[in-house]
Amino acid sequence: MKKEQVLIEALPYIREFYDSIMVIKIGGSIMTNHEILENFIQDIILLKYIGIHPVVVHGGGPEISETMKRLGKKAEFVAGLRVTDRETLEIARMVLLGNINAELVSLIGKHGGKGIGLSGKDGMLIVARKKPPMNVNGENVDLGYVGEVEEINPEILMITAGKGYIPVISPIAIDRDGNSLNVNADTVAGAVAVALRAKKLISITDVEGVREDPDDPGRVISQFSPSEFQRLVERGIIKGGMIPKVEACVRAVERGVEKAHIIDGRIPHAIILELLTDAGIGTMISNIT
């Protein structure tokens, strides 16, 4: 496609999405590839330049696990959620805030944008409560310092985005007593999207989307509605770490976000392809057919 055709194709989408908020969650597995990360940063800066307000939420699971391994600590997961004792919480805080968040903000600046790093503790952005024990095979398992979102206070996001900044959020929350809690980044992204009344929630991951057959990357479900989610879980199509990712998208759509997308960040400039071209990639979750 010629360059001018690309621009003409993008025009109606730019018009449709102008001045709207897009919450974009980037997974830790994607951030380990520097070239992919650079493409992601370029995409969100382009969105900002054309009048769209991107709000970034990042994970960091692989880097947290790698740091734990170097420190001789084993990572444990239950239903895709990290079991978090106090030592694990401190490691997560160090990796998420000190490493990943700082790097993303730095890269945004390198490419001509204005990033601002935030955790859920800033301005009481993410207020959470401790997640109750989970029933696993008839046994209650305490996840430790793992939180579930109780409240999002989006004022700090609206102020910074309105002044030309791209907010970059780490999923470390605060409870009513001032304690830190580790919250699943997908859950945070979904809750932030609802609180901001975002036009879209976009989850950038390292798979093609929701696969019809989990073992066949060539067969991707292009679209489904929230009402189909439980059936897909029961059939084993959505499982493991994909469950909280897809569930966050489903809950966001149920609570007012127009559309949620799970797209493959390994594709160069995946966000632009999804938002500003007719092609579309990955899986869309929506009540709109």
UniProtKB/Swiss-Prot annotation:
It holds the Pfam family AA_kinase. CDD domains: AAK_NAGK-C. Keywords: Amino-acid biosynthesis, Arginine biosynthesis, ATP-binding, Cytoplasm, Kinase, Nucleotide-binding, Transferase. Its main location: cytoplasm. The keyword Amino-acid biosynthesis applies. It catalyses: N-acetyl-L-glutamate + ATP = N-acetyl-L-glutamyl 5-phosphate + ADP. GO terms for cellular component: cytoplasm. Substrate binds at G60, G61, R82, N182. Belongs to the acetylglutamate kinase family. ArgB subfamily. This is Acetylglutamate kinase. It comes from Methanothrix thermoacetophila (strain DSM 6194 / JCM 14653 / NBRC 101360 / PT).
